[in-house]
Curated annotation (Swiss-Prot):
EC number per UniProt: 2.3.1.82
Reaction it catalyzes: kanamycin B + acetyl-CoA = N(6')-acetylkanamycin B + CoA + H(+)
UniProt binding sites for acetyl-CoA: N120
Signal peptide segment: none
A Pfam family recorded for this sequence: Acetyltransf_1
Name assigned to this protein: Aminoglycoside N(6')-acetyltransferase type 1
Keywords: Acyltransferase, Antibiotic resistance, Transferase
GO biological process: response to antibiotic
GO molecular function list: aminoglycoside 6'-N-acetyltransferase activity
PROSITE patterns assigned to the protein according to its UniProt record, in alphabetical order: GNAT (PS51186)
Subunit structure: Homodimer.
Amino acid sequence: MIVICDHDNLDAWLALRTALWPSGSPEDHRAEMREILASPHHTAFMARGLDGAFVAFAEVALRYDYVNGCESSPVAFLEGIYTAERARRQGWAARLIAQVQEWAKQQGCSELASDTDIANLDSQRLHAALGFAETERVVFYRKTLG
């Protein structure tokens, strides 16, 4: 079953977020989660397995700036998607993406975008399996001033 993330399931959401983004502190994750819950331009969904435990999540945001490879605005942007290892290959990501797409359409979007690190081949395979088409490969640069 797919449910929207809310104040009643924060602990499970935090656990899944921490598994996907382990470098973030619990305090940082909680602050971002509060921002998502307070924003009309963001939402998050979780998947609950047959045993009642939450096993996967997806976060999505509306982006009004340019999104690489997209032709419309706003664009629904998949900020993160994760399935616990014990629940992989059971279709949870596909069910989450279906819910994300429905939300995006309700927000007036005609495109769903995402990104991943160029070295993250597992994520690239997942995106392809979920129906995403690669649009660009970009290298970012930085120069410190001072």
